Amino acid sequence: KWSSKSPGNYDYPAPQGREAVISEVEQAQEEEEEEASVEFALSSDIEDDYEPELLLVPEGQPVNQPMLAAAQSLHREATKWSSKGNDIIAAAKRMALLMAEMSRLVRGGSGNKRALIQCAKDIAKASDEVTKLAKEVAKQCTDKRIRTNLLQVCERIPTISTQLKILSTVKATMLGRTNISDEESEQATEMLVHNAQNLMQSVKETVREAEAASIKIRTDAGFTLRWARKTPWYQ
């Protein structure tokens, strides 16, 4: 289950126009730095057995939810493997759940500004972990082609996750506002969704390439990730 501190509410004035949005983005970024860290994460001991409700499409909601679909796609890829002894898989699963939470915050229209910004920060933190571990796997991989492929996909992640934090802050300032046009709000949502899709796809590809690279690591290298396939429930 998700755990967080009470996020509270921003008490913004209601200026008009695009300059107001930019001003609020800057204010939100300043205030978020002062906030204590809040984590949307699962305990690692239940991660493997947890079937998250956040990744299900609620009744009455449209099926076409691209951000949630991207989270589901990454989660399906990550849950092929046990996260025990594999921090890349554990971080990828956290990212999928966090992205599903972000989808809920954005989709519902009732999301809390601070919760959305914090969720983006937590996603960025998990993505940094994936990138760091993937680079270590690449460093130890003896196959040049596989090593190059892994580095190419994982090195995209930091830039995309940084963009996610910025776009989430922009979108957060619009939540609950009545003086933002539908066009501006929709544009901000579309940019955020597109970024989320790119991030989930990059992490998904990183998981696949890291597994391939792990096979090409010398046993005496001193660095290992445990890649244990999970047995499907129907077997």
UniProtKB/Swiss-Prot annotation:
Q: How does it sit in the membrane?
A: Peripheral membrane protein
This protein's UniProt keywords? Actin-binding, Cell adhesion, Cell junction, Cell membrane, Cell projection, Cytoplasm, Cytoskeleton, Lipoprotein, Membrane, Phosphoprotein, Repeat
Q: Name one Pfam family in it.
A: Vinculin
Q: Which GO terms describe its cellular component?
A: adherens junction; cell projection; cytoplasm; focal adhesion; podosome; sarcolemma
Where is the chain membrane-spanning? none
Cysteine-cysteine disulfides: none
- Example GO molecular function: actin filament binding
Keyword Chaperone applies:
no
Q: Name one GO biological process term.
A: cell adhesion
The record's subcellular locations are: Cell membrane; Cell junction, Adherens junction; Cell junction, Focal adhesion; Cytoplasm, Cytoskeleton
PTM description: Phosphorylated on serines, threonines and tyrosines. Acetylated by myristic acid and/or palmitic acid.
What InterPro entries does this protein map onto? Alpha-catenin/vinculin-like_sf (IPR036723), Vinculin (IPR017997), Vinculin/catenin (IPR006077)
Q: How the protein assembles, per its UniProt entry?
A: Exhibits self-association properties.
* Function as written in the Swiss-Prot or TrEMBL entry: Involved in cell adhesion. May be involved in the attachment of the actin-based microfilaments to the plasma membrane.
Q: Which protein family is it in? A: Belongs to the vinculin/alpha-catenin family.
This one is known as Vinculin
